[in-house]
């Protein structure tokens, strides 16, 4: 059976440039759309987080005024149904990548608080990439890629095509001002061949085993590309 590891941020905040706190976490739709699609495809899905900490869903991602009544209700229903799994993630440091076919990272601002600098996240990604396993991330999830460094301190994803939430979308969302750093800009500076589509429209980039989606709207299309790659 195909076995997928979804790595969830353990952060419940994003520390801003001035030290103020922006309450955050995992963007619910990005987790739900990916997890639901993988389970429906018949894959076994494990969840992990730094320290095995129970992930926090960004409250904005469950706000009907933000995402719409239907989406908010679907998110809450799925999260409630899967509460036991979500509340008992594996400890990321204890993950053996040999047992997985794909490593997947949803976004929300959580990853730009913790996963981007988490050494265990980096190890998991390095091991997965060396074994040519599928690596997928969406929205702010590609921040996790920044944690990966090879034995020479180099970023193994330099020169690879990828996408993430664009700087323009960060500005439109209202979180670019006072941000300690912007994800798309940072990925470019690290050497990524960054691509993006229209704001808030689905856009997925495939470069070998690296699959990335731009925004929440890209979650289901990304899941479909991951599933196709694993068939």
Residue ranges and their predicted role:
Residues 135-136:
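Conserved, well-structured core segments that form or line functional sites
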Residues 139-141:
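Catalytic nucleophile serine of serine hydrolases
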Residues 1-131, 143-231:
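Extended, subdomain-level signal for the structured scaffold at the beginning of enzyme domains
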């Amino acid at each position: 059976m195909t076995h997928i590891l979804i790595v969830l941020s353990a952060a419940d905040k994003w520390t801003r440039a001035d030290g103020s706190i922006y309450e955050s976490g995992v963007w619910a739709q990005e987790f739900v759309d990916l997890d639901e699609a993988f389970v429906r495809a018949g894959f076994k899905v494990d969840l992990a987080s730094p320290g095995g900490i129970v992930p926090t869903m960004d409250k904005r991602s469950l706000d009907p005024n933000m995402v719409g009544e239907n989406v908010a209700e679907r998110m809450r229903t799925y999260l409630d149904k899967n509460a036991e799994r979500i509340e008992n993630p594996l400890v990321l440091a204890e993950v053996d990548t040999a047992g997985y076919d794909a490593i997947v990272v949803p976004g929300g601002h959580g990853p730009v608080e913790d996963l981007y600098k988490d050494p265990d996240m980096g190890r998991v990604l390095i091991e997965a990439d060396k074994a040519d396993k599928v690596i997928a991330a969406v929205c702010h999830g590609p921040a996790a890629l920044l944690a990966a460094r090879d034995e020479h301190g180099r970023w193994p994803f330099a020169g690879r095509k990828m996408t993430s939430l664009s700087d323009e979308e960060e500005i439109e969302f209202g979180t670019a001002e006072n941000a300690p750093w912007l994800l798309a800009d940072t990925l470019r500076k690290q050497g990524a061949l960054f691509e993006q589509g229209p704001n808030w429209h689905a856009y997925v980039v495939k470069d070998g085993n690296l699959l990335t989606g731009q925004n929440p709207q890209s979650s289901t299309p990304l899941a479909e590309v991951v599933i196709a790659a694993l068939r």
